[in-house]
Each structure stands twice: as structure tokens, then as C-alpha cells.
């Protein structure tokens, strides 16, 4: 029987220490500590690659996802995810898969938080499945049920400059035409 209230995380994890631009011995020791503590299979290979400086950046994101999954599994959560290790930011990540979105630069949201704001300059179209690769990778490495955090369409629209839609509305002749849009 399924649990009435399965446990799951809400939000993101901090980036894995080895995803920093500069990887020092401190980050390597932290990676080794967490790899051992979480029981990450093969973490020794990652530590060796970090020490030698011979690694592929994309592979580090794979490792970060595995560490995130193991973190939540070892915490005993019923439904897990990777803590959004591959995502730049919850808005920018999906917007990079939308044709018609042009990034204008960073805007301040909270005290020190910023995000890269886009404008919708033409009819928006999805260029690829946004979350599929993340899900398939996590599915291969998780031993628990998965959830995929999705940034909803309201947030994507609200956080974007609607230039295309303003232009379409300006071109409409009557109030009735505008209502149909």
C-alpha cells in the first residue's frame, strides 16, 4: 500500500562542491567525504579525476546528480530528485529551450539573488523536451520514486518581457479582435 503522505524535498540543493569554477583540495576532500558518507558507487574515480584535473565538465554534472539523489535517498525520503544540480536557475533552465526567448541580462530579485531575464520576441516554440534528459538520467540512478520539479507556465510568462504579445495586440484593429487573442 502506498503511503498516505510520502516524504519529498521542496527546493534545490546547493551545488556540489566540485561544480565550482576553481576546484581546490578543500572541494576534493569535501567530495570524498560526501561520497563515502552517502555510499556513492565509484566516487573514488571522481576524486581521482578531480585531483588529476582530467575530467569532462558534463560528467561532473552527472556526478552531482548522483550525489543529490543519494543525499535524498540516505535521508529516507520516499520521493527523490537530484536537487536540480544541472539547472542554472529555475526560470532560465526551461527558457533556454524556448525559441522566441531572447535573454537581455540579469535582474535583481531579492537581496543578492539575480536571474537572467528574457523577452518573448516572437511566437514561443519549444525546441526540445525540457526535462526529459534529466528524468531519464535520474531514473537510471535512483532506487526510489522520482519527482521532476517543473517551472510552471505562469512563472515563465510572468518573469518574461512579453514583447511579441504586445506587438500582436497593437496590430489588432478592434476590441473584439483583441479579446480573441
Tell me the role of every PLM-derived stretch:
Residues 1-181:
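Domain-level signal for soluble alpha/beta catalytic cores
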Amino acid at each position: 500500500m502506498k503511503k498516505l503522505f510520502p516524504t519529498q524535498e521542496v527546493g534545490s540543493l546547493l551545488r556540489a562542491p566540485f561544480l565550482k569554477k576553481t576546484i581546490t583540495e578543500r572541494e576534493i576532500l569535501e567530495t570524498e567525504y560526501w561520497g563515502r558518507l552517502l555510499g556513492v558507487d565509484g566516487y573514488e574515480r571522481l576524486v581521482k579525476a578531480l585531483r588529476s584535473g582530467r575530467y569532462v565538465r558534463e560528467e561532473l554534472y552527472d556526478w552531482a546528480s548522483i550525489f543529490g539523489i543519494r543525499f535524498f535517498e540516505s535521508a529516507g525520503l520516499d520521493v527523490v530528485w537530484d536537487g536540480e544540480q544541472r539547472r542554472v536557475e529555475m526560470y532560465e533552465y526551461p527558457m533556454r529551450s524556448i525559441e522566441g526567448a531572447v535573454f537581455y541580462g540579469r535582474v535583481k530579485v531579492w537581496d543578492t539573488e539575480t536571474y537572467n531575464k528574457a523577452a518573448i520576441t516572437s511566437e514561443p516554440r519549444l525546441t526540445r523536451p525540457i526535462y526529459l534528459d534529466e528524468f531519464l538520467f535520474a531514473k537510471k540512478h535512483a532506487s526510489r520514486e522520482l519527482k521532476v520539479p517543473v517551472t510552471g507556465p505562469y512563472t515563465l510568462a510572468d518573469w518574461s518581457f512579453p514583447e511579441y504579445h504586445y506587438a500582436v495586440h497593437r496590430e489588432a484593429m478592434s476590441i473584439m479582435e483583441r479579446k480573441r487573442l
